[in-house]
Each structure stands twice: as structure tokens, then as C-alpha cells.
Design a protein with these regions (language model features):
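Non-catalytic signal-transmission and effector/linker regions of two-component phosphorelay proteins
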Residues: 1-8, 112-129
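Two-component/phosphorelay signaling modules centered on CheY-like receiver
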Residues: 16-34
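Acidic, metal-coordinating helix/loop segments flanking the phosphotransfer/catalytic sites
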Residues: 35-53
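Receiver (REC) domain active-site loop signature in two-component systems and cognate sites
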Residues: 60
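Hydrophobic/aromatic residues positioned on beta-strands within the core alpha/beta folds
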Residues: 82-86
Length: 129
């Protein structure tokens, strides 16, 4: 069963090692993946209706994941995204002040690659229905 065929994922995380790992793992699973370590580069190359899922680090130097997700959603309002983060609770609580639904969109680091696989498959499968 090749449910990953044709699914496009965008990854934005300032940790290059993690970005490379996620990209290689997801490509091995059959996804088409674009990965960026700079949120501004990701934003400048983003196009509407290209990605089935966007995975964003929550805490990045140039622009946090919430800001980036808002800018991406201005381009593609139906965008499906999740934040992957190891940010501390205080940082997340501060972001939740203006984004009360933030918590339901967070995947916490560290995580196992199988967790990524299961979560992505669930998100994309449920989104197709």
C-alpha cells in the first residue's frame, strides 16, 4: 500500500542535522520533501497548493514557527501544519497567549522516527477523507 506516493512535505527547522534526518527519513518513506533551515528562505519559495503538510520548528532565530505558519497560511489558507519543538514550557506559554489553539498543533522533541511516521501518516490520511 503506497499511500505516501505524491504527498509533498515541507520541513523548516534551524537545526540542520535534524532537518537532514527528517528529510532523508521521509524521502525513504516515499514522500516528496523540501527542507529548509532558514524560515525566510522557506517563505520565499513557498507556493500555494504544493504541500500536503508543513512541519515547522517552533523556535527559530529569524522568525518563530507561529509567525511563519501565519505567513504561509496567508498564501495557502487550507495549509495543514504541525510544529515540532523542544522549546521550554515558558516559551510555549508565551506564544499561546495570542494563539490559544497552539498546543494541539505541537509535536514535542525528542521524538522517535516512528512517531514522526505515525503522526504524518495519520495527519495526511485523515486530511484526505
Amino acid at each position: 500500500m503506497s499511500t505516501t506516493k505524491g504527498k509533498n512535505i515541507l520541513i523548516v527547522d534551524d537545526d540542520e542535522d535534524l532537518t537532514d534526518l527528517y528529510e532523508a527519513f521521509l524521502k525513504f518513506d516515499g514522500y516528496k520533501v523540501d527542507a529548509f533551515t532558514d524560515p525566510l528562505d522557506a517563505l520565499s519559495s513557498f507556493r500555494k497548493d504544493v504541500y500536503d503538510l508543513v512541519l515547522l520548528d517552533l523556535k527559530m532565530p529569524q522568525m518563530n514557527g507561529v509567525e511563519l505558519s501565519q505567513k504561509l497560511q496567508n498564501i495557502d489558507p487550507n495549509l495543514l501544519f504541525r510544529f515540532i519543538t523542544a522549546a521550554n514550557k515558558e516559551y510555549i506559554e508565551n506564544l499561546k497567549t495570542n494563539n490559544p489553539d497552539l498546543e494541539k498543533n505541537i509535536i514535542y522533541k525528542p521524538l522517535w522516527l516512528n512517531e514522526i511516521r505515525t503522526t504524518i501518516h495519520s495527519l495526511l490520511y485523515n486530511n484526505d477523507q
